[in-house]
Each structure stands twice: as structure tokens, then as C-alpha cells.
């Protein structure tokens, strides 16, 4: 009982598709490396322009210190310098600056960085949320430069907290920023309000600028970068941009726009829709800059008017890319979690509606996440075992028919079309499908790929240890190499080695039972592919390589059990003999195939006849 040619083709196709998937997943990193020089040059140009603009703006906007009416650009404030006030709940702590009345450093209480520090977002001088307003005496200023006065933090019985920042000029024009943070939530509600909006703003909409810097959070910065995207919901459809491709994206009718790192999001959301949004970003020259990416996102926000009063209702999400957490906000943020992309986008439905509920159920009853992965993999392999059984059963039938196929091959060795037709007749009379070994293997691809994306994207694996792996969301490192080996790296992942070894064992066992080893491609490809995995898997999260090890081990055990103890050769031969006694009923598809083969045979015979006459 061995693996027939079609079964091997199926597994080779799986390997090819898997390699294609790794290619697409590394697309952002390849693009990033290809654009480094261009990005570095563009950053220098942008910085020079920015410095010139800042210098001009500073001179133009510099108030006359001798004239109190020009202090704070003509807006009232009880403070002469920036101060900080905080809102917090059990999940998040947000610091607000009265300069600009805007959010500053965000601390996620339940998460740590790779070096044990609290995860901080929106931290640093680069981060700001601002817009331009008209000030007295026909001047203008960025609201991020204006000092606001804030009221005391309001705490409600439901656990929510809110704060209002206000400023006004001598004529009564007033600006207020209200922020509300609910209990047990990462979403920050925000409302910008204007009294006398037509005088404060030069346009009918609010032109908002959001600058955000994504810091290093994970240990493997290079892999973290490949998982960093600019995501948006435009006209009701989610899409994203690799940060290594281009540096800007223009959008219309956009619900939200945000930056996703490997496991964390920073997102600005409109209660209505942004009329326009322009996303732009650039990458650091090297790791010494201590950030992954900087973004400059601009928005055209519609005003909700009531007479001369206008509001801009917004929300900001700073938190984990947890599918369940994001989904509860009902604005489509859960699409950020990459449960399936590119040619494998369809597997996201398997992950969302099957694997995630199963995973949640198991992890609530099992403490160790490595055991959770083992149990899920075992469950999936048992569910797909009938497919595996059909594949090996088809191989066993092919092996029984092999002597007759070899006889036909010898008889029609000079006429491949005739051989193909007779082989089809033989298979049909015996009740054997030529695709019986290939299709079951291909049908396993969606399951395999859904598990791949699921374990790669699930934040619940982050920081969880198992055996020698300290973090299942990062590669396991049992030894460091003082230099980098091409296509491998500078470290040794033991789970990768176990995955490769189990893959080789499957190949060795399968090839030992294969009835036809004459084709060099069929003979060596199953051995080459596992070795290629050594370089591909070495920097992948330990959860993936552990899953692959478990999956291979279970597959090998099932393969031995099915072939040694379940498949009965005598029954197969008896079934084939019984099928031959039955009248052969051809399907329409088979009739068309045989008709085409017959036509091709007649055409070839005619060509041969004319050739002989010549």
C-alpha cells in the first residue's frame, strides 16, 4: 500500500503553494529592503523641508511677549506650561497634555515588550493630533501649540471617565476637546467642538493631521516589520498596504485608518466617515532610530453643525489586535487580524467561525498554550483523517492495478494517446478514480493554511512559554550563531529542526511504499522540500513550528495505522473484481474526455498516415 503518483503530485503541489505563501508573506520585507536608499533620500528631503517650514512658522507665529493679548495665540489658559492629566481603567492608561488638549503616552497594562517593559504607544514628541485654526488679528496656528484649560476628571458609576479641555478667545470663540474612556475598554471616545466654527476654521470641514510613531515591541524587529501594515475601511471594504511598498495612499469615504504592528493597533475612527484621508508613512534608516514606522495621516472630517456650533465625533483605539476585542466595537476593526491574505484569503472564514471558537473553548480549560496547540492539531488531523484514508485507499487500488497498467504501457509504448485511453478504461472498469490520491491531499490545503495564519496572528500566544520556547509568538532560540548564514539566519530554532525531521520521516516512509520511483522529480522532491523548510521556518513563531511538528507526527502515525491495519488488500482486490462485473456507466465529463482523446487519436493517425505517404 503506497502513495501513488497523484498523491505525490498532491503533496508537491502543497509544497509549491506553501512556498508561494511564504513568498507573498515576505513581500513587505523584500519591498522594504529594495526601497531603503529611496526612503533614506526622501526622509532627508522631507526633514529639510519640515525644518524650513518649522523655522518660518516659528517666526511668523511667535507672540509678542510684551503684549498679553498675543500670549497663547490670543486664547485664554490658566496654565503657562504643558501639564499632564490621565484617564485609566483596568486595561489602559492614557496621559493627556493640556498643550493641544490631546492624548499622549498610552500604556497597555496587560502587555509587556520583549525586554519586560510595559507596552507603550503614542509616546514621544513625534506623536500628535492637530488641526489649524484662525487666531486673532488674522493669524493662524496649530491647535497642538495652544495651551488648553482642563476641567477635573469626571468619574461615573459605570466606571467610565471623561475629561474636557477648553480654550476661548476674547470674542467668545471657543474650542473644546472631550475624551471619554469606558471601563474595561481600549476605545477612547473623542469629540472636538467649536463655537463660532465659521470664524475658527477656514474651510467647511475640519482638516485633521494625525502623526503616529510605532515603537519596537517584539524581539524580532525584522519579522515585526513584515507584520506591520497600514489598514483602512474605505467605502465599507477593508484593505491594507504593506509599509515597504510606496509611501502614501489616498482614500475617500473612509470609516477608519490605522497602523497595525504585529500584535497592536493605533487607529483613528470617524463616527460618520472621513470625506477624504491621505495616508503617508516612512521607515527608519536603521534600527538605531528605535521605531518601526512613522505615519502622517491627514483627514477631511465633516462637521456636525447646529447653528454656529459644530462637532466632530471621533474615536481612537490603542490596544491589542485581539479578534474578539476588536469585533465588539462593531466597526470592522477585526478585519485587521490577518487570518488569511492573498491567494489564501478564503481561509479567514475557517479561522473566524471554526478555529477561533474551538481555540477559545480549549484555552479556557487548558492552562498551557503548547498543549492547546497540540489538542487543536490533534482534533483537526482526526477530522481530516477520512480524507487521508481516501488518499491511501486510492494508492492501494492503484498498486493493485499497477501490473495491468505496466502491461498497457508496454503494449502502447509508441502511442501515448492510445495508452491514456486504455488506462482510463481500466480505471473506470475497476471503479478507481485517477484523482483519488491527488484531490484528498489538495483538500487538506485550506485546513493547513488556516492553522498557519491562525497561530501566526493569535495574540493569545504572545508571551506564553512552552518547553524551551519562552514566547510562542516568537522563534525559539536554543543557540545563537556569531554570523548570519544565508537563507537560515543567526540562530538555531529547535522546533524548526523537529518540524524538518518529522517531514523527512513522512517522506521516507511514503517513498518506501511508492510503486514507481523511476521519475527523478517524484523520487527526490519529497526529500528536497523538508530541507527547504529549515530556512523558511527558522525565524517563524514557535507556535507555528510546534504545530507543524505535531501535525507531521500525527500524520505519520495515522499513515502507518491506515496502511498497516485498516486497508485490506484482499477486500480491495475483491471490490475491483466486483466492479468489473458491473456495467460501466460513464459520466458526461468522462464521455467528453474520451471523445476528445478519440478525436486526437484519429488526428494523430491521419498525420502518421500522411507522413508515411510522404
Task: List each language-model region with its residue ranges.
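Soluble non-transmembrane domains of integral membrane proteins
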Residues: 77-337
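Short extracytoplasmic
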Residues: 44-69
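A general marker of short, structured functional hotspots
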Residues: 19, 28, 66-71, 92, ...
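Helix-loop-helix
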Residues: 1-51, 96, 190-195, 209-224, ...
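N-terminal, polar/Ser/Thr-rich
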Residues: 33-34, 38-42, 66-78
